[in-house]
Each structure stands twice: as C-alpha cells, then as structure tokens.
Amino acid sequence: MMQPIKKIAILTGGGDCPGLNAVIRAVTRTAILKYGYEVIGYKFGYRGLYNNDFVKLDLDSVSGILHRGGTILHSSNKDNLFDYQVEDENGKIVKKDVSDVGVENLKKEGVDALVVIGGDGTLTSARDFSRKGVNVIGVPKTIDNDLLATDVTFGFNTATEIATEALDRLHTTAESHHRIMLLEVMGRNAGWIALESGIAGSADVILLPEIPYDINKIVEKVKEREEAGKQFTIIVVAEGAKPKDGEVVVSKIVDDSPDPIRLGGIANKLAIDLEGLIKNHEIRSTVLGHIQRGGNTSTYDRILSTKYGVKAVELINSNLFGNMVALKGNKVSYESLENVIGHTKNVDPEGELVNTAKSIGISFAD
C-alpha cells in the first residue's frame, strides 16, 4: 500500500519559457490548499537536486508570479545526473552517473513525489528517475511545441504572439523603404513558431525545417510581388531551416551540454545569398532570439500552465506516477513518460496549416 503523500518537490529544467512560473504557482497552491502537502523547489533544475539546494515554497513565495516569464527556481540545460560532469581523484573532469545522489537527497528531505517541468531532455531524466523508483510527474515545456504526446506545450502561444508582433512591426519599415526583411525565429527541428506567426503576421515566405527551400523560389516570389506593385517582401525563417541539398547553419558548439549543437544565423546567411541574386532591394535580417522566451506570459499560456500544474498534483494524489500531463483536445489528461520520450511533433508539409498558408499565397520556396 502506498504511503500517504506529505511532501512534494518541483524543479524546472532546460531553457526558460513563458509559463514556468504559472506552473510552479499552480502546483504549489493546489498542493497546499487542496491537499495540505508541503512543497519545496530545487534550484537550477537537476543541479539543485544533486547539490540538495532547494527553497521552501508557500503561498507567499508564489504570489505575484503568474504573469512573469522565466522561473523563480532558475534552470539549467547542462545538468543530466545520469551523465554528469564531476572531478575524479586526479582532478580530471569526467562524466559519471550520479543519479543515486539525487535519489538519496529526495529521501533525506522526505520528498514523496517530484514534479519535473521541462522539455524532451529534462523529461528523459524524469523517466529515468521513475525507473529508479522515484515518484515522478512530468509537465511538458517547450516554446517549439514539438512534443508529440500533447497537443500544445505552454510557452508556444506566447512565443508565437511575440513573433507575430515582430512581423507586424517589420511590415511598416519594410514597406517604407522597399526592403526585403527576414525574421529568424526559434524552431530547431519543428517550424511551428515560424508557420503560425508567418500566417498570423502576413509573411510572404515561410521557411521551415520540414520543407527544404530553393533560394530561386524566393527570388521568384519577390519578382511576383514586384509585378503586383508590392515593393517589399517579408520572410520568416525557422532557425533549423535549410536549403535543398544543404545544411543547417550552426552558430556554435557547447561542449559541456547534452545538446551541444546550437543553431542560428540562417537569416543573415540567406540575406547575403539573396543580395547576389536581387539587385534592386535592400535586404535586412533580424534575429528574434531569446526575446521569444522572455517577458510576460500570454493569457492562453497562463491558463494552460495553471491547468497543467493542477493536473500534476491531482496525478500525485491519485498515485499515478511515471506520467506526464498532456493536453488532448480541450481536456488535460496524461501520458506515460515511457511513451513520450523521443517522439517529436513536426509540421506536416501536406497538413492543414501549410495548405492554409499556400491557399492565401504564402510561399514555402519548395
């Protein structure tokens, strides 16, 4: 028979994302007000679990954070306790499985269940801790919206709204100066932000990781617009977009990261390439970057994050561990962590949204 739950912990891992604080708030308030649990939060993700570095969470500590971006618990995207950098007896940095330290720290603090908020990498470790007997509940987080097991991840709506507003602003300057403007948005393997903001922000060309582009098709679109009396063109490009028979643009390699290859720079490269093909327009590129992650959280994401946080605690109370909360249609449900890891949700090149965009004249340069 399961022991009654008295104390739970929360940690946030991976890149920051609008809605993290809303989840922390919802978990804490539900745990205290509905079930009478004690709540702590580990700082800087799994690093805090390894170092047993935590703070007590109560109603006061989560007051006023619903709208705020980032995470009051801080985060790290470099700390995998199953492959963690430590110093050996010779002072050499080596990678080692130190997950047992995390398990022991949970036991030492009397933590009965752990809520892990993160993307694929963070949730992979959550699954692995579940396999070691830890009572884990996952909450999916990524602005890329690329987790297959849930219809929507929190943070995506906010990021898309920010990208859409950026496109709105670029329109006025592009039209004033007859420029071709490129906006680079996040989207390593999945182009959801570029696709949805491109439709909502009235882009002329959308470039996605899922649809390799032909630069000559972009030139054709610019000429088509010129012939229609439009002397400017707006292009939104996901950071993972690449030309046909080409490669993605890598900005840097982070050796101590579980995900060392960092993309970025495709908009600037494409602007340079286009300058050699289009002579009568200025071409400018803008990288939206981490602006997509920061600032206040949208209304939709505040509500979705709150629903996720409440559901996470309800799963704990029902002893339904080893699961991740997920949105299915309009209902928050759950899915086994064993089934969600490594399964990404990519844009379907033949899907409804791509068809919608093409039907209103948007080019994918394919």
Curated annotation (Swiss-Prot):
Protein's cellular compartments: Cytoplasm
Cofactor(s) required, per the database record: Mg(2+)
Catalysed reactions listed for this entry: beta-D-fructose 6-phosphate + ATP = beta-D-fructose 1,6-bisphosphate + ADP + H(+)
Activity regulation as described: Subject to allosteric activation by ADP and other diphosphonucleosides, and inhibition by phosphoenolpyruvate.
NCBIfam families: PFK_mixed (TIGR02483), PRK03202.1 (NF002872)
Similarity comment text for this entry: Belongs to the phosphofructokinase type A (PFKA) family. Mixed-substrate PFK group III subfamily.
Protein name listed in UniProt: ATP-dependent 6-phosphofructokinase 2
Gene label: pfkA2
